Every structure is written in C-alpha cells, then in structure tokens.
Regions:
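Bacterial N-terminal signal peptides that target proteins for export
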Residues: 1-9
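Short, linear, compositionally biased motifs with a strong N-terminal bias
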Residues: 13-14, 31
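Boundary at the C-terminal end of the N-terminal hydrophobic targeting segment
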Residues: 20-24
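PEST-like low-complexity, intrinsically disordered acidic/proline/serine-rich tracts
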Residues: 27-356
Length: 356
C-alpha cells in the first residue's frame, strides 16, 4: 500500500533547492538539505507571521532532542487544511524539513509532516492551485484578487538596477536589520507580488485596497487632491489616483525609509515614487498591475514591470495579526555564516535571476 509520505517524495525532491528569499526567516535554513525525523509534538503555536511546533525526538546517540519546526503564515496554511487544532501535544508525527545551517541549533523549515492516522500536512510550497479560474468574469477591477507569487522575480529585477549605494547596502545587510522581525508589513510594490488575498473597493472619492496580511488599509484618494507639501512620511506613502478610461492610475510618494523598501536588502528613501496602472486582462479573469518604481538614491534607473492578480470571487480575506515574539523567534541562534549565505544567495539572484 502506498502511503501519503510516498506520494510526497517527488515534491520533496523538487523542494530540495534554496528557500525563497522573500521568506523573512530563510537565512537560518539549508535549502539544499532535507532531513526526516520522527517524534512527539510538545508544543504547537498557530500564530503569525510563522507557525511553529516543537517535536521531541531521539537522536542517533539515544539522547532526547527537541526540534523547533517553522512553517508559513496561518493565512496560507489555513487554506490548505491547517487549523489551530491540527497538532496537539502528544501527537506522534514524522517530519520532512530543511535543517538549520547552524548544526548546534535543532531548528527546521517544514516541507511536510504525517500523523499516525495518515493525515498529511504540508508547507505552502506544496499547495494545489488555490484559485482555479472562476466561472464568471470580473466586471471591473473591484472585487477579490489573488496575486501571483511573483516577489522573487521582483527581487531579482531590483538587484540589477541598484546603484553603488544600493549595492553597498545590499552587501552590508544583516538579518537583525530586517523590518519583518518587528512586524513591519512588506513594502510596496513587493506586497503586490505576495500570494495573499486582496480586496479592492471603489468608492466615490477613494479606492480602498485591503491586503489580508496587513491591519492597515491602503487609501487611494480620487477627489482631485495632490500630494501634501511636507506631508508625513508613512509605510504606505500618500496615494492619489485617477481614471484613464477603465484604467486606474495611482501615484504614491512620501514613503518612509525602509531597510528593504526596494528589494530583498535594498533600502528605500523618501525620494521613492511608485506609479501603478490597474487594468483587466482581455479575458477579464486577471488584473494587470503595471508599475514604475523610482528611487534615485538607490536605483541607477527606474524599474518598469508588472504584477498579475487572479480573479478570486470565491475567496475571502482571513483576519491577520502579527505576534512580535513569534516574528523575532527565527533570529535566535542566527550565525555569521547565515549572513554570508544570504550574500551568496543575493549574488546568485543578480547573476542568474534565480531568486528562490
């Protein structure tokens, strides 16, 4: 009889590659290695920005070892069968995962697990297509949308356009500088390529975009106002918009400085300017977001590209909150070697475009 674990082997083989750079805690793990352990669950923390559980196992020397296993956001895992009750202390499980780079740390990044009753739970990377083509076309850009997972390509594009100052900042980056460890949301336009549900509302005087991984809505003013002089800098910046036919044009300025505001480790400055054009595809099943990203302090030239979102009227936003203690947990035991590995991963990204 073929077990669920046997069915996962091909996928596990595929996943034995470097972990995505966008994952705020990829630094501690060796994405080229895959290990398997069996043991007993001692703790399960179903919290954001990453789910953790702990497994007590016996090593080759016969000693008892407790492993810390990290997975994805609760919003992602909830869509592939996970709940806050998926694991209980005392459950016997088998875990397939990427181990920590630091051999002294019993720490893993989950690929999949199997419970004694045959239940298999996987990471987000092994999910099926979560937004099959809808039966109806979108009437306009308003509605619920699921972005393609395109942020790794965005990282590669920005790395190529970084000027001398941007490259120097990229090379000097250390993981303790990562704003994600302080629950700071992902910056624009990176978040446009994160695979989390977005809802667009079109009102008389504004457009409201709600991303399920942020507590703050993005407001685009449509009443003809300009950007305020000496306005307050903020994470989302100040956005104004207008219609050109069926195309929503959005201009955003007054961004607060962000250590990763222009890519994986490229900062952004108050000079950052983002222009977006939202329009439906010919099939009316996808939303195209063309954008121009400018920041002369860190870029040699503007980045011109696009993201695509899939129409997903059957999906809804899952409430999100970020737990600061959980957000910082991955920093424990991070070694200097991990930072060196990050630099090598960035170099590969720039040279080959292989950014995950």
């Amino acid at each position: 009889m073929v077990s669920a674990r046997d069915l996962l082997i091909p996928a596990v083989t595929i996943l034995a590659t470097p972990i995505a750079l966008g994952h705020h805690s990829s630094a501690p793990f060796d994405g080229d290695a895959v290990v398997t352990i069996e043991g007993t669950v001692t703790q399960f923390d179903f919290r954001n920005p990453h789910v953790y559980f702990y497994v007590e196992s016996t090593d080759e020397a016969g000693s008892t070892v407790e492993w810390e296993v990290e997975s994805d956001w609760t919003t992602e895992l909830s869509r592939i069968g996970w709940t806050a009750d998926s694991l209980q202390p005392g459950d016997r499980i088998e875990v397939i995962a990427h181990p920590a780079r630091n051999p002294q740390r019993h720490y893993m990044n989950l690929i999949s697990l199997e419970k004694e009753d045959g239940t298999v739970l996987t990471s987000w990377d092994l999910r099926p297509d979560e937004a099959p083509p809808p039966a109806v076309q979108a009437a306009g850009i308003a509605g619920t949308w699921l972005p393609d997972r395109d942020f790794p390509r965005f990282f590669g594009l920005t790395a190529r356009l970084a000027n001398e100052k941007g490259l120097a900042a990229q090379e000097s980056f250390v993981e303790t500088e990562n704003p994600a460890s302080e629950c700071v949301p992902h910056p624009l336009p990176q978040r446009l390529g994160n695979p989390h549900v977005n809802e667009i509302q079109i009102l008389d005087d504004r457009v409201v975009i709600t991303a399920e991984t942020e507590s703050e809505q993005r407001i685009i003013y449509m009443d003809g106002r300009g950007h305020p002089e000496n306005g307050e800098l903020s994470h989302h910046g100040h956005s104004i918009g207008w219609w050109e036919g069926d195309v929503l044009v959005v201009e955003t300025t007054q961004f607060a400085p962000h250590r990763r505001g222009n890519g994986f480790a490229i900062p952004s400055s108050p000079q950052k300017r983002l222009t977006e054009r939202y329009h439906l595809s010919e099939s009316r099943l996808r939303l195209i977001v063309d954008y121009v990203l400018e920041d002369p302090e860190y870029f040699s030239e503007p980045l011109i590209n696009s993201f695509e979102w899939q129409y997903a009227p059957h999906m809804s936003l899952i409430p999100f909150s970020c737990d600061l203690e959980v957000a910082r947990r991955y920093l424990e035991g991070l070694t200097d070697d991990s930072s060196s590995d990050l630099t090598r991963m960035r170099t590969t990204c720039v040279a080959t475009g292989r950014c995950e």
